[in-house]
From Swiss-Prot:
InterPro entries xrefs: Ribosomal_uS19, Ribosomal_uS19_bac-type, Ribosomal_uS19_CS, Ribosomal_uS19_SF
Any GO CC annotation of this UniProt entry: cytoplasm
Gene: rpsS
GO biological process, one term: ribosomal small subunit assembly
Name of protein: Small ribosomal subunit protein uS19
Function noted in UniProt: Protein S19 forms a complex with S13 that binds strongly to the 16S ribosomal RNA.
Length: 95
């Protein structure tokens, strides 16, 4: 279920403040954040934000197409290694 429209989009106040500070200084650097639930605002376009995936920080370069999405959508938390099946050795032969 999506957030109520009367509340408006959520963004971490500290993260938005750091982005605006970088915009004023006309500076680009990687910002680390644990706030996966923050909505991407137009002020963030052009910045690289390292989003925590539970294990490490994944660098995400923000583009115009990402505005309105959540930061966590671009840093997957699970690694899919494929379904079980027949084992294949390094030379491509079945065991």
């Amino acid at each position: 279920m999506s957030r109520s429209s009367k509340k408006g989009p959520y963004v971490d106040v500290r993260l938005l403040g750091r982005i605006e500070e970088l915009n004023r200084a006309n500076e680009k650097r990687v910002l680390r954040t644990w706030s996966r639930d923050s909505t991407i605002f137009p002020q963030m376009v052009g910045h690289t934000i390292a989003v925590h995936d539970g294990r490490r920080h994944v660098p995400v370069y923000i583009t115009e197409n990402m505005v309105g999405h959540k930061l966590g959508e671009f840093a997957p938390t699970r690694l899919f290694r494929g379904h079980g099946g027949k084992k294949v050795d390094k030379r491509g032969k079945m065991k």
